């Protein structure tokens, strides 16, 4: 009986600190990966880099004032391209500018789960430091292609393309992430934050600085 009472009191204490939160984050930084595309005969090498940053949606359940479990989804992509003017050609009485294009890109969908720890460092509980570390699952879709583009000299809306080469592959990778940052309670249950994170798996690793907003219920 005493154990049940103690458990019940512990549960009440635990629930007093329990709440959920949702948020959005934008990050940008440096990325390394193993997807390099070399067109040896053309003398062209492509090394896709992160474009438009990394957008993340996240949510979590705060078990205590210091500990929560967070889930998130992120989308990001790497891109690189190169073009070269070959010359002009005539076809059906029209003159066209002949350009050769090379393109390589990677689209990534990432999911993560991470325990997170928070610590207030002011008396009013407006500022807090965060650290999280967890596991990622990322689906990479890589695609490279080369094609010839012919654009009518007198009207660039008239054009056609001929594919020279295309290749694609998919990778599913388990990885690791760690991140830290600070949040500020700007209004009521709304928090704004700055963060830095590092993520690594067999396909890529990244170091990103981010800004975020989250709402706690």
Feature-to-residue mapping (PLM):
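Repeated loop/turn-to-beta-strand initiation elements of outer-membrane beta-barrel proteins
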Residues: 20-22, 66-71, 124-127, 184-192
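Detector for outer-membrane/organellar transmembrane beta-barrel domains
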Residues: 23, 27, 111-120, 126-140, ...
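Predominantly the C-terminal beta-signal and adjacent terminal strand-loop region
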Residues: 76-82, 176-217
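Residues on the lipid-exposed face of transmembrane beta-strands in outer-membrane beta-barrel proteins
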Residues: 24, 57-61, 73, 113-119, ...
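Short glycine/proline- and aromatic-enriched beta-strand/turn motifs that initiate or cap beta-hairpins
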Residues: 16-63, 69, 75, 111, ...
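Extracellular/periplasm-exposed beta-strand and loop segments of Gram-negative cell-envelope proteins
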Residues: 31-52, 75-110, 138-173, 198-200
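Cleavable N-terminal export/targeting peptides
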Residues: 1-21
